[in-house]
Swiss-Prot record:
HAMAP family, A to Z: UvrC
Species whose genome carries this gene: Methanothermobacter thermautotrophicus (strain ATCC 29096 / DSM 1053 / JCM 10044 / NBRC 100330 / Delta H)
Name of the protein this chain belongs to: UvrABC system protein C
Assembly and interaction partners: Interacts with UvrB in an incision complex.
Gene behind the chain: uvrC
Stated family: Belongs to the UvrC family.
GO MF entry, a single one: excinuclease ABC activity
InterPro entries reported in the protein's UniProt record: GIY-YIG_endonuc, GIY-YIG_endonuc_sf, GIY-YIG_UvrC_Cho, Hlx-hairpin-Hlx_DNA-bd_motif, RuvA_2-like, UVR_dom, UVR_dom_sf, UvrABC_protein_C
Length: 579
């Protein structure tokens, strides 16, 4: 890369330019068919206050020449992702969104990941709804029985309860397994009808070969996929593939919503927050470059709220898709109606974001924090008289739950000693020097719990702001103050939400541990019920009460369960212990 200070020394050629400050930090990355003309324009434009601030910090300019504008676009996108310059319009915190990964192993797995590796695996995402991704992955595994184990050391629990084809045990050929993975691939592309057509052909062949059990299984797969399709109830007459992209801007923050239409049905919605002050068309183009730079299915048509003036974006997307991609902004008709739906969603998201931002600012003032608490962690303990004690950490980023960052702990402290349990939780959470430190720690409890948490943090050598919130009167306590502090309603609402999330997560884990222990103890004396069936019962029915209330037919329907053992379990809980 070549570096200059005088813009007149820049080449009149296509490429990428990089603004750096006196500490060599990257301020901004851009592309142009004429680097000299584009960079010179920054020195003339003085209306944008954000631009004026950037130019005051500018110390040097680097440039990289490319053969054409498409190469420049790809390089610009990669450099923005690498350096995350403060003055570029960019997706906020995009790393925390999950992806679906289909691995490139001999027998591929399907995983949820948060980064894209430099490998030949297939990735889908990012997805903004982590819960929906987990539910979808669970459905995929139950439908297609793909492997989950990292190592193929032999048959595992899933193969024993008929949830995996067990390629580790040679029960399925590589070719047959790859055909299953291709169906999974189509599913994540939203091409449900194609999956159904393939499965219907397989069901027909199985019936002709008198493989009725296999045919019935395929029939159930088809019904499950049709249920997914029915949930995507909004549909159109044309079987089209489109992305509908609309944005709403407020100050230096913009919300963008993408409606995904596959085979004429709305199959998904993604929403993103972008940082950076720029004209709406520039924000839109910056979003498109970042959104599609991540491996994902590119539709044949992209409808945008404003015309996209940079023609190289469509050229680049067409190359990614392998055929022409049209980007246009319809004036009316169904396309404009869809854009209005996306825009209304973006407007609501931006308003909510504004309210949360105001509440975080108020929280900073009310709690006398050194900075806005962008990352907050709430800690809670759940137990009954010291039994099955668990601890949880809920994480909020910019006022919203980041459920993928939640953590839970099995507490080893003995007896009903809440202080000892909180001390253990804090020390286990913050003892690692690699852990990202939060801007605020919230303890579910009053002055006593707050004092214990402070002491534990001190033992860990961690110095972060800590507050406690008492359940009884929703009072907020700061270290060193005997009386609770006044907190604005909006700010208090965020603290309550964080406290409630930590409590919910701790209680959920506590119940899981308690039910598992109770179920294992209750089933110990029943002949034919070993560890595998115990786990299958808990996973299927969720609790001891669920097993107790189940009929013989429901018990027998669990994969790997015989009717004889199901009847034995049912008799046990009915009070008839014979047999």
């Amino acid at each position: 890369m070549t570096r200059v200070k005088d813009p007149e020394k820049l080449p009149d050629a296509t490429g990428v330019y990089i603004f750096r400050d006196r500490d060599d930090r990257v301020l901004y990355v851009g592309k142009s068919i004429s680097i000299r003309k584009r960079v010179s324009s920054y020195f003339r434009e003085q209306e944008n206050p954000r631009l004026r601030i950037m130019m005051r910090h500018l110390e040097s300019i680097e440039y990289i020449l490319t053969q054409n504008e498409k190469e420049a676009l790809i390089l610009e996108s990669n450099l923005i992702k690498r350096y995350r310059p403060p003055y570029n319009v960019r997706l906020k915190d995009d790393k925390r969104y999950p992806f679906i990964k289909i691995t490139d192993e001999e027998y591929p797995r399907v995983l949820i990941v948060r980064t894209i590796g430099r490998d030949s695996a297939r990735y889908y995402g990012p997805f903004t709804d982590t819960g929906a991704v987990r539910r979808t992955l669970k459905l995929i595994k139950s439908l297609f029985r793909i492997r989950s184990c990292r190592r193929m050391d032999g048959p595992c629990l899933n193969s024993q309860i008929d949830l995996c084809y067990a390629p580790c045990d040679g029960r399925i050929s590589r070719e047959d397994y790859r055909e299953i993975i291709e169906k999974v691939d189509l599913f994540f592309q939203g091409r449900y009808q194609e999956v159904i057509e393939v499965l219907e052909e397989e069901m027909k062949e199985a019936s002709e070969r008198l493989e009725f059990e296999r045919a019935a299984r395929i029939r159930d797969q088809i019904e499950s996929i049709r249920e997914v399709m029915e949930r995507q109830h909004a549909s159109f007459t044309d079987s089209i593939d489109q992305d509908i992209v609309a944005l709403e801007r407020g100050g230096d923050t913009s919300a963008v919503v993408v409606l995904q239409i596959r085979d004429g049905k709305i199959t998904g919605k993604d929403d993103f927050i972008l940082r950076g002050s720029a004209p709406r068309t520039e924000i839109l183009e910056a979003f498109l470059k970042q959104y599609y730079a991540i491996p994902r299915r590119v539709p044949s048509e992209i409808l945008t709220q404003y015309p996209v003036e940079d023609g190289v974006i469509a050229e680049w997307l067409s190359e990614l898709r392998g055929e022409e991609v049209k980007i246009h902004s319809p004036e009316g008709g169904a396309g404009r109606r869809l854009l209005n739906i996306a825009w209304k969603n973006a407007s609501v998201i931006l308003k909510q974001k504004g309210r949360v931002r105001d509440a975080l600012l108020q929280l900073k003032d009310d709690l006398k924090l050194p900075e806005i608490p962008r990352r907050m962690e709430g800690l809670d303990i759940s137990n009954i008289a010291g039994e099955s004690a668990t601890g949880s950490v809920a994480v909020f980023i910019d006022g919203k739950p980041s459920s993928g960052s939640y953590r839970r702990y099995r507490i080893s402290a003995q007896g009903p000693d809440d202080y000892a349990m909180m001390r253990e939780l804090v020390e286990r959470r913050y003892s690692s020097p690699e852990l990202r430190k939060p801007d605020l720690v919230l303890i579910d409890g009053g002055k006593g719990q707050l004092g214990v948490a402070l002491e534990a943090l001190k033992n860990c050598g961690v110095h972060v702001p800590v507050v406690g919130i008492a359940k009884k009167r929703e009072e907020v306590y700061l270290p060193g103050l005997s009386e609770p502090v006044d907190v604005d309603d909006g700010a208090l609402q965020i603290l309550r939400h964080l406290r409630d999330e930590a409590h919910r997560f701790a209680v959920k884990y506590h119940r899981t541990i308690r039910d598992r222990d109770s179920l294992e103890s209750e089933l110990d004396g029943i002949r034919g019920v070993g560890p595998v069936r115990k786990r299958a019962l808990l996973e299927h029915f969720g609790s001891l009460d669920g097993v107790r209330d189940a009929s013989v037919e429901e018990l027998a329907s669990i994969p790997g369960m015989t009717r004889e053992v199901a009847e034995r379990i049912h008799r046990h809980f009915s009070g008839d212990l014979a047999g």
